[in-house]
Amino acid sequence: MSVMSSANPKFVEILQGPYTGVLTTLFADGSPQSTPVWFLLDGDDILFSTTAGKQKLRNIARDPRATFAVYNPTNDMSYVEVRGTIVVTDDQTANTRDRIVQKHGYADGSAFDAPGTQRFTLRLTPTKIIGR
């Protein structure tokens, strides 16, 4: 049984919402680097899309551990934190980006990128899920 499939259904509901969360990766000295991000629940994993040159890519290449937190804006006391590891893959078709922006009401994500932008998918596989 996966961590996500055994998670509280309320946590899964938050992760399915069109919210902004905070992805935290680790600098080389172990200090946190946090970024507000859109995301997509994809089966048991959480997907993010990013572009070349971002600090989070350098951090993940060195240490794939990460945490992701999102709260329900209609109830500030309702949140979920997902801890796990991230695998980075090339996303030249920007499929992940488009799926994420569609969740937020945009037809596609082409307006978010300049021509020639190099896109990557970050796949967070949970090892622990907590929340309220």
Name every feature range the model reports, one short phrase each.
Residues 29-31, 72-76, 114-116:
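A short beta-turn/loop motif at secondary-structure boundaries
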Residues 18-51, 66-70, 80-81:
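Short beta-strand segments
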Residues 12-13, 43, 104, 132:
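Charge-dense, helix-prone N-terminal extensions
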Residues 2-6, 78-132:
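Charged, gly/pro-rich active-site loop segments
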Residues 19-20, 65, 105, 129:
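Generic structural signal for secondary-structure transition and capping sites
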Residues 54-56, 75:
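Short, surface-exposed beta-strand-loop junctions and turns on beta-sheet-rich folds
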Residues 1-20:
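Extreme N-terminal tail/first-helix region
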